């Protein structure tokens, strides 16, 4: 399915996704940057130190042109964990881009470089430095002479619901997954029509650690071939609904073979508990059980203490 780094880049590299991210984070969701105004630039820059050539590689970078004028170079850097030296890394990325402008034809106008650090952690806030002077100790008397470089860290899982709703592409669904993972609840997906289904599901798989997203990807591929999904129907809600129908039926059938009669007598709630216990015994992930049974994470964790793995 690919590594986190690879799958993150793969989705973000699409012009519509990149423009959407940039518009929400730079222009409060206004449709300022058009996808047809973006051009991909090489993610690698080189520089020479002591006669040795070194490379600096960004995650994703695009040049924004409007009416043939360069407005800015925008770079995205993905982080799943806080990086203490991130300000130093961003300086290297930005510095390499400015060096390229310095070495270019003098007739070409220079333009600003903007780097957005997309923090995808869900367990804790970004705890690493956000500016250069927090990376080291220094004589305070020298403070006014030190150029303090600040970085733009965006904690995706902590964006407000209002901010998340400003995303117009399926990147909104990904941010919703991060938010709901942080809150320990069943993902609540907006009905956004998907253009990059495979890339989104691959990213959700590696970021959540839930193998069921790989099954969803395979089922979705088949559903697309069979025209069960098309046009406006291609949304995360529809994909999850179709994809988990079979898993839900199998889980309930398995539960019934091991005592669902008593669960029926006690009502629908007990049926869900029995299904969850069966899935726990089979080693299914808590996230998957929550998706199938609609039980809160706290209840599933409580049931987990009562179940021995098969």
Predicted regions mapped to residue ranges:
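Conserved single-residue anchors adjacent to enzymatic active/cofactor-binding motifs
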Residues: 1-226, 310
């Amino acid at each position: 399915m690919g590594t986190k780094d690879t799958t993150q880049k793969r989705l973000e590299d699409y012009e519509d996704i990149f423009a959407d991210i940039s518009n929400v984070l730079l222009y409060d969701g206004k449709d300022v940057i058009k996808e047809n105004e973006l051009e991909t630039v090489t993610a690698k820059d080189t520089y020479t130190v002591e006669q040795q050539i070194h490379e600096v590689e960004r995650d994703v970078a695009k040049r924004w042109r409007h009416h043939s004028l360069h407005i800015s170079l925008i770079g995205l850097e993905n982080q799943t964990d806080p990086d203490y030296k991130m300000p130093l890394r961003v300086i290297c990325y930005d510095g390499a881009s400015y060096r390229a402008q310095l070495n270019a034809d003098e007739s070409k106008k220079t333009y600003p470089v903007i780097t957005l650090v997309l923090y995808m952690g869900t367990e804790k806030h970004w705890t690493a430095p956000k500016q250069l002077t927090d990376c080291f100790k220094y004589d305070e008397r020298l403070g006014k002479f030190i150029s303090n470089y600040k970085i733009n860290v965006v904690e995706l899982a902590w964006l407000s619901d209002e901010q998340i709703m400003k995303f117009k592409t399926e990147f909104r669904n990904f941010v919703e997954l991060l938010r709901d993972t942080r809150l320990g609840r069943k993902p609540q997906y907006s009905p956004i029509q998907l253009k990059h289904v495979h890339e989104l599901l691959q990213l959700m798989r590696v970021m959540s650690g839930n193998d069921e997203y790989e099954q969803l990807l395979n089922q979705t591929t088949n559903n697309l071939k069979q025209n069960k999904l098309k046009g406006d129907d291609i949304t995360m809600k529809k994909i999850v609904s179709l994809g988990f129908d079979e898993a839900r039926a199998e889980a309930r059938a398995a539960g019934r073979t091991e005592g669902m009669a008593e669960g029926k007598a006690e009502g629908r709630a007990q049926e869900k508990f029995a299904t969850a216990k069966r899935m726990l015994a089979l080693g299914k992930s808590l996230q998957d059980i929550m998706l199938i049974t609609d039980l809160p994470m706290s209840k599933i964790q409580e049931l987990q203490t009562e179940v021995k793995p098969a």
